Each structure stands twice: as structure tokens, then as C-alpha cells.
A protein has these predicted regions:
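Intrinsically disordered, metal-sensing/regulatory segments
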Residues: 1-276
Length: 276
């Protein structure tokens, strides 16, 4: 029987407790997004821990492609227009700052991976991503409750493939996969807390907030694009051989198809559900 991570269990319990506060504050959309994110990462982690020594590269490409395509489209359609609508210049600066902040955090995060900490580095990076994404989701939905669920669900869709990959690595390293309960709950923990905050009613501030959210999510989505290269994540997790150039060429077609389909799915949902 695999070990149960205490810090992972604490993360889950924190989400349960905060969910009670969210229900009393009528943060229904934030609560739904929080638990969808938890179910996506925890469920995919359970599958990843049982996947054995190899992972089917094509399935991995499609999982990342669908999620990143949906996320890029959602941020571009639902957040960018809101940011520019509040204030064109400040909204634009917010988008730029969000992308640059995402890049900076990702780059510095790789440096922190070399530190000696009593916590799995991959799980630590996932937790940081989840807490940041949750805080932004909470701010956006807490101050713009008329937004539909489609944006939030598309944004957290990448939690599934991320949890699958992380669990596969932890399982191969002989570490408890249950530590991923913390990043799985992380989105909800910070989303519920930040949704209780009220952003001052100012077009400039709202432009920066929504622009920053769009920029961060665009960076994260582009980071999850399925890059089929030697030494890349698909190559590493699927344990392809060094002479797998032909397979990687085939996977590039699937990468383009999956990201395109992810965007098309969001467009179809917007046409059929989000439109009055």
C-alpha cells in the first residue's frame, strides 16, 4: 500500500473547510471550479500512478494539446477583451506584465528546483502554480461574477495532464503520489480566499487586474503546448528512444490537431452555451 502524504491530506482538508465558507458566501462558480480542478488533478494522478513504466506518447500529446488550446482561446476571448474594455493602455500593460511575470516565475522556479528542501520539487512547482492560478481565478470571479463557468473550467483543464505526468514521475521515483493532493487542492484554497477580496472600482485597476490574469494564463497555456522534441517533456515521460525522430515527427501533427481542437471546442461551447 502506498504511503499517504500528510501535507497532501492537509491540503485536501483545507479545501473542504474553505468550501464551507464559499457556500455561505454564495461563491458557487468559484466552488465549482475549485472542485473540478481538484478532481482533474487527483483523478489524473491516480491514473498516472498506475500507468507502469511507460506512457503512450500520443495520449500525452492530446491531453496537453486539448488543455493548452482551450486555455489559450479562453484567455484570449474572455479575459483580454475585458482588460482592454476597462482601459486599453492599462489593460495592455497588465497583459504584458502577466506574461513577463509568468516567465520570470517559471525561470526562477527552475533554479529553486536545485535547492535541498524536504518536499518533492515537481510537487512544489505544481503547488506554486496552483496557488497562483487559484488566486487569480478568485480575483476575477469574485469581482466579475457574471463571467460564465467556461473560462474557469478551460483554465483548470491543464491540471489533468499535469497531474498525470507528475504522478508518473513520482511513481517511478518511489515517492508517494498522494503529495499531489496539495497542488490539486491549491487552486480552490487560494481561489476561495481571493474571491472574498474586493478590487477597488477603477477602470485602470480593473484593466491591470484582468490584463495580468490574461497574461499569466496565456503564459501557462503556452508552457503546456505539446512540444515534440528530443529531450522535451513528451520525449522524457513517454520514455522514447534516442532514434525516435520519426515518431516525434508524427506526434507533431497530433500536437497541431489537438491544440486546434481545444480552441474549437471552446468556440463551440461559447456559441451554444455562453451566447444569450
Amino acid at each position: 500500500m502506498s504511503r499517504l502524504s500528510r501535507i497532501g491530506l492537509l491540503g485536501f482538508l483545507a479545501l473542504v473547510v474553505l468550501s464551507g465558507f464559499a457556500m455561505s458566501a454564495e461563491l458557487d462558480k468559484v466552488l465549482a471550479i475549485a472542485w473540478v480542478a481538484f478532481a482533474a488533478m487527483a483523478g489524473a494522478a491516480a491514473l498516472g500512478s498506475r500507468s507502469g513504466e511507460s506512457t503512450h506518447a500520443r495520449k500525452l500529446v492530446w491531453a496537453f494539446g486539448l488543455a493548452s488550446g482551450a486555455m489559450i482561446t479562453s484567455a484570449a476571448v474572455f479575459l483580454v477583451p475585458n482588460a482592454i474594455g476597462h482601459h486599453p493602455q492599462f489593460g495592455g500593460f497588465g497583459i504584458a506584465f502577466g506574461i513577463l511575470t509568468g516567465f520570470g516565475a517559471h525561470t526562477i522556479g527552475h533554479r529553486l528546483m536545485h535547492l535541498d528542501v524536504p518536499f518533492d520539487h515537481a510537487a512544489l512547482e505544481l503547488t506554486a502554480h496552483s496557488l497562483t492560478a487559484g488566486a487569480i481565478i478568485g480575483l476575477v470571479y469574485g469581482n466579475m461574477p457574471e463571467l460564465g463557468l467556461l473560462l474557469g473550467l478551460a483554465i483548470v483543464s491543464h491540471k489533468g495532464p499535469a497531474g498525470y505526468v507528475a504522478a508518473h514521475r513520482l511513481q517511478r521515483a518511489g515517492k508517494p503520489v498522494s503529495v499531489l493532493l496539495l497542488p490539486a487542492a491549491g487552486v480552490g484554497i487560494t481561489a476561495i480566499l481571493s474571491a472574498l477580496l474586493n478590487v477597488p472600482s477603477s477602470d485602470a485597476i480593473n484593466g491591470i487586474v484582468f490584463g495580468f490574469a490574461a497574461g499569466v494564463f496565456l503564459h501557462v497555456a503556452m508552457d503546456f503546448l505539446p512540444r515534440c522534441e528530443l529531450g522535451g517533456e513528451v520525449y522524457e515521460v513517454a520514455q522514447l528512444s534516442d532514434d525516435a525522430h520519426h515518431l516525434l515527427d508524427k506526434l507533431r501533427t497530433h500536437a497541431v490537431a489537438s491544440t486546434t481542437l481545444g480552441g474549437v471546442v471552446v468556440f463551440i461551447f461559447w456559441l451554444t452555451i455562453a451566447q444569450p
